Amino acid sequence: MEKLVIGSRGSELALWQANHIKERLKKECSMESEIRIVKTTGDKILDAPLNKIGGKGLFTKELEELLLKGAIDLAVHSLKDVPVVFEKGLDLACITKRADVRDTFLSVKFPDLMSLPKGAKVGTTSLRRSMQIKFKRKDLDTESLRGNVQTRLKKLECGEFDAIILAEAGLCRLNVQGAKYRKAFSVKEMIPSMGQGALGVEMLKNHKHFITLQKLNNEESAFCCHLEREFIKGLNGGCQIPIGVHANLMGDEVKIRAVLGLPNGKEVIAKEKQGDKTKAFDLVQELLEEFLQSGAKEILEKAQLF
């Protein structure tokens, strides 16, 4: 029997995601598969903030190269890590149903962000999170926090940080409590990254099983995630820049929230649009235009200097 080869990063969370797709392939597509672990640039360089490593696709490039060579059949990604422009010949075969999209505050001593003392050290890998934290609390010190989920939690428990921010979806998937204090931000309090909470399965567009994999697609999640990706694409952005965007369907309407700014919490633009879901992509373009008129491009150019 033919076995599909699934490419995956080697972290516990990445392997959970790959095994999730493996199980669904068997159950819903009657297809056997095996997992091949691949180290990406983002996995190899752990002593520098992600935005300092440079380039797009820090967690996807090596997987995409193997897809193009035919060495793997599909790659399973956290959708938030997937660049909005694909290498020629590649595309997303499916986007899974979203898990919890929220970001979560974790601390050993403090119940929430507002209870942190002045000068407290908050760990995060994300300029987007850092920007929104500093916008709320300019007196806090945000510092780069690299490593897998367990490594980050150990650094918190050892006292290297007063608090850390992680994706709620990752904590839930690994069934991790995290710390004494754990509080998820609402989407309004901290706008997530594009595609946060969803998995993206990438393949060659001409792969014989590309259409088959679309059985794993969740229509609502895919619709919202494509709106978010369209917004990022319009700003020529990537996953390592301080932009948050979240689209949410509410019956026949869609609400799109977005934020961008400097990592130090200055010069922040935050806007939202709501309207008929049949005109959702027009809403994205309107939102983009408002951001551009408010100086979004100039702010993002400045953000690259941080």
Curated annotation (Swiss-Prot):
One of its GO terms (cellular component) is cytoplasm. Binds 1 dipyrromethane group covalently. Its cofactor is dipyrromethane. InterPro entries: HemC, Porphobilin_deaminase_cofac_BS, Porphobilin_deaminase_N, Porphobilinogen_deaminase_C, Porphobilinogen_deaminase_C_sf. It catalyses: 4 porphobilinogen + H2O = hydroxymethylbilane + 4 NH4(+). It comes from the Bacteria. Keywords: Porphyrin biosynthesis, Transferase. GO terms for molecular function: hydroxymethylbilane synthase activity. Gene3D superfamilies: Periplasmic binding protein-like II, Porphobilinogen deaminase, C-terminal domain. Pathway: Porphyrin-containing compound metabolism; protoporphyrin-IX biosynthesis; coproporphyrinogen-III from 5-aminolevulinate: step 2/4. The modification S-(dipyrrolylmethanemethyl)cysteine is found at C239. One of its GO terms (biological process) is protoporphyrinogen IX biosynthetic process. SUPFAM superfamilies: Periplasmic binding protein-like II, Porphobilinogen deaminase (hydroxymethylbilane synthase), C-terminal domain. Its EC number is 2.5.1.61. It is an enzyme of class 2 (transferase). Monomer. The porphobilinogen subunits are added to the dipyrromethane group. Tetrapolymerization of the monopyrrole PBG into the hydroxymethylbilane pre-uroporphyrinogen in several discrete steps. PANTHER family: PORPHOBILINOGEN DEAMINASE. Belongs to the HMBS family. This is Porphobilinogen deaminase. It comes from Helicobacter pylori (strain J99 / ATCC 700824). The gene is hemC.
